Amino acid sequence: MDQFIKQDETGDLIETGMNVANHFLSTPIQGTNSLSKASILPGVAPVLIGNPEQKNIQHPTASHQGSKTKGRGSGVRSIIVSPSEAGNGGTQIPEPLFAQTGQGGIVTTVYQDPTIQPTGSYRSVELAKIGKERMINRFVEKPRTSTPVTEFKRGGGRERLLKARQSKRRA
């Protein structure tokens, strides 16, 4: 059974995602301080701790315990921010999806949440709008025509082949 997302639901989902992205883009990054326990909002920690994926990672099953694996910390990589980069919170990161040729048009951006002030590249906001439109149009059903559409079937034209064989046998 196919489940379709209605157009207004898709718009709401994308709008929520855009608000989350704008929230994180609007706050300056201050080195490794943003990754501390203090950055977790009160009341969110029980949800994170109760996450079933986290429980699965912390308590592997018996079938996985016997396998040879590297040390627990081997897959963890720390991010080191140089002091010159850490002091410049809110610096603009170049957009890798667009060619940096210096040729750009005028982009008008409409923000629905007045508390979120845009920072960063307006090109990325425009790219997100294009992606939103594509996602909305992707799941919209196309109108069906009144005339039936003939579908290609494997081995099609078999009736003509059988009639030709029967006419050869009669001759």
UniProtKB/Swiss-Prot annotation:
Residues 54-98, 145-171 are annotated as: Disordered. Coiled coil: none annotated. Residues 54-68 have a biased composition (Polar residues). It comes from the Viruses. Residues 151-162 have a biased composition (Basic and acidic residues). Belongs to the Orthorubulavirus I protein family. This is I. It comes from Mumps virus genotype A (strain Jeryl-Lynn) (MuV).
